[in-house]
Amino acid sequence: MNRFPFGLRPSQEAILRFRGGKMGVAAVPGAGKTYVLSALAAHLIAEKRLEPHQEILIVTLTNSAVENFSTRIAQHLRTLGLLPRLGYRVRTLHGLAHDIVREKPEKVGLDERFTILDEFEAGRILREVAMQWLMQHPEFIENYMGELNAEREREARREYFPAAVEKLALAFIRTAKDLRLTPERLRERLENQPQSLPLVEMGCEIYAEYQRVLNYRGGVDFDDLVRLALDLLESDPGYLKRLQDRWPFVLEDEAQDSSRSQEALLRLIVGDVSPSSGRGWVRVGDPNQAIYETFTTANPYLLRRFIAEEADERPTLSESGRSQPGIVALANRLIQWVMQEHPLPEARDALQPPFIRPLSEEPLTPLTGWGFQAIYLQSKRYAPEEEVKEVVRSLKRWLPQNPDRTVAVLVTDNRRGGHFMEALRQAGLPAVELLRTSQTTRTAASLLAEALEWLEQPTNAKSFSEVYQKVWRRSEEKEERVKAAAGWLRHCDVIAYLSPFPAESDLEEQFAGLPPEVQDELRAFRQVARRWQALTLLPVDQLILTLAPDLFTTAAELALAHKIARALAQIAGQHPDWQLPDLIRELRLIAENERRFLSPGMEDGFDPEAYKGKVVVATIHKAKGLEWDRVYVTSVSNYEFPSGEEGDTFRSEEWFVRDGLSLQAEMLEQLNCLLHPEEYHVYEEGVASRRARVDYVRERLRLLYVAITRARRELIITWNHGRRKTNIQALPFAVLKEWLEQMKKQGGSERA
């Protein structure tokens, strides 16, 4: 009889033999990490390894994973004949830190009623502080501006440098908090630093003001929570000992995404453990799926080092039942090529074993039905819009024949995802999205922004015409009468047209030569536009609510307009100095998928199985942890997935910054010089940017690996030449394409 009644694979059973000490587990995609960790928790409870007051602590990355773990553990406990809700606690790392701080907030200088600012509000405060800093330090732009023509330079000053400063400030503050550095400690070090470190100066000044605003509001952000929890436990040994006694076993999921401070917090709670101590720390993760390093403080090398140097046990979860053997073989080939043949030797550690082992050990042949023949790497050189059209055409053929299958289109950024969603909508194909904001939200925000922009500049005839055709008559914008009316409005005298006292004869004179149906359109829109103009003195929320019935027809659209109005009213209240253009800018950021709005959306607890027969459009980052029968991976060019070869470009190197510098890499290098002068003697500009290229290459290789391993049955990979027509196939795309063709010619006789 199986001593583990959970239906486990052999590699999973090895983990359930854990009794104490430190265990580090490298897991492949589809290895069942959640299943085996929840089974281990249930098994430790069943073996009565806990005192009545003790719990097993399970720490994971997302709120949806918390719910998933809780459900799984309860099911396992029922299988073992035990009560389903006793003996364990499941928390996110930030949730755990919040629990710790909430018990004794006064110990870390917080009021007992302290609040946690969500991502949206914390981002808004940071944006305002960063913009104030940039206005006070115009020399920053001069110091880093590249050689541009006059028009591009104006664009960079107006849009791109402000966004860059905000992004830099966020990276600096997150890093400083992960290192547990306060603005005061940083300032003290800077005053004793002989070198010029301008990017650290910038980061420190913005950090200090940002933190001052948070303190004034009695709030903390998510990055504060872990730092404060560490401070509290280090300053209160009795409290720490109580938590260590409460949680003798700590099981950590997605450990490849932990940061230094997060690892330190768990290390404190775990305390001294050995295989015979009756206490334990299990860390499970897949360093090959570490795809957040460049824009968070996540550090996948922490898990690798733990497994190699600290762990008492090092089992691997290498068996996967997710993907068919051909896709497994393709993913393994990518790992092998990166390790042995990547042109950048420094990037060859981006992907490491374990290789994926399919549950079926049968050789791949055309007769097995699901092998290499279900993988397509399209070598055709598409324009960006042609790639979208080709994928949509393919889906139009596939969806009717596969109503009970799941399918996803994976993109590299939210804006590209918006293009696919619009094309799917126009093609009449059912689609859902895992992007920063939904298409419905983006459309509503865009329409409202168009209307408000005209009200801000009411004499602008071009804007006036756009509002008429693209907003008020958007469902009929291609009809001849609408196009004719829009053409007339584009060149009209807006003041004369909207004047409240023209005689009918004056209107007829203005409309002379226009068909009657066009004149009727212009008279109708004149009434609407005049009514809108009368609303401009209203507060922004009342203005939007009054405009909404003229712009939207469905209950869902009107409800969304109400939410937008409420959100903008809150923003206006927090920023009484803001004018209408500032609020319009916020709407534009939502419309362009650059700003998350209202709530995290469907990705929390998203289940692809609930959307059979529909197309899911997702960024690769949002797709992590999910799987579909058929997957399209798009935009696999050397722009999105560079290999460090000549001609490759890097997103981290902004086009408007001189000398190809990555300002974030340079800033963090300057911070290292400040903190570790014995190791980083002299700051040399450009060195960090070159090193950041390698880091970016590594992360994009892992991102491609994640994308490939989302597919269960069929995989299609495409690429495009970009707006400037200079992109080529990503090098790993070309390598995998050549290898795949060889496999198909050989009849697929290789084992996965």
Question: Which residues does each PLM region occupy?
Answer:
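Conserved helicase C-terminal RecA-like lobe
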Residues: 453-710, 714-721, 739
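Short glycine-/polar-rich loops that comprise or flank the Walker A/P-loop
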Residues: 51-55, 84-86, 277-280, 286-288, ...
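Conserved short internal alpha-helix adjacent to the catalytic or cofactor-binding core
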Residues: 41, 73, 99-100, 108, ...
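Short, polar/flexible loop-turn hinges at active-site or ligand-entry regions and domain interfaces
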Residues: 51-54, 77-87, 104-118, 130-143, ...
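P-loop NTPase Walker
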Residues: 1-112, 116, 241, 278, ...
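Conserved helicase NTPase motor core
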Residues: 4-35, 57-58, 89, 117-122, ...
